[in-house]
């Protein structure tokens, strides 16, 4: 059920001047291959997002996929949602991603409607939500915008609603942090990426993706008022957390 893509060769040749990473047409074309080969445990996270949605979704409520890219989490949730009167609102600010996401969503029939929107997730109203997903999205916002968005999500969640937040993590202990970075690079090598590709991708993304520690995430959840929160999945320095209102 996952969308197919061309192989990711974006960083395979030397680039004289490496610009900041953007989710443009080139990335959208190879995104499924890129993320499977770059994010350890990605398929497990996508599958479990559907299971969590099935458990937490309420009838006549909204489900949000903020930073939906090609719609993998949206499709996983839609397959699991059995409640009446629900809709999924999938949002991304990349025109190329949104266009492809609509094609993927429309390729499968479902009783749960999906509204795919091209917009900045910071400007989206969160209302009557039982499930909100931020799947490797928050880390691309400026640090000052993260708290504001999470506050908005909390306000728009129904009591008992869940936020699913997948992120890359930094670790406060330097030895642990370096080991997990090295293991992630080993993972990418095992998936066919060259040293040049790993190095150039890192240079392109380091200015636009600034990950937090698990402690920082938990402190934000507590300050905002979530009643329960924890890590439910981790592989190397990538993982996913839940926060329940």
From Swiss-Prot:
Keywords associated with the record: S-adenosyl-L-methionine, Transferase
Give its E.C. classification number: 2.1.3.-
Lineage top rank: taxon: Bacteria
User: Which residues does the record give as S-adenosyl-L-methionine binding sites?
Assistant: 42, 67-69, 92-93, 120-121, 135, 202
Reaction(s) the record says it catalyses: prephenate + S-adenosyl-L-methionine = carboxy-S-adenosyl-L-methionine + 3-phenylpyruvate + H2O
Q: Name one GO biological process term.
A: tRNA wobble uridine modification
Output the Gene Ontology terms for molecular function.
carboxyl- or carbamoyltransferase activity; S-adenosyl-L-methionine binding
Q: What does this protein do?
A: Catalyzes the conversion of S-adenosyl-L-methionine (SAM) to carboxy-S-adenosyl-L-methionine (Cx-SAM).
Q: How does it assemble?
A: Homodimer.
* HAMAP family in the record: Cx_SAM_synthase
What protein name does the entry list? Answer: Carboxy-S-adenosyl-L-methionine synthase
Q: Which organism encodes this protein? A: Vibrio vulnificus (strain YJ016)
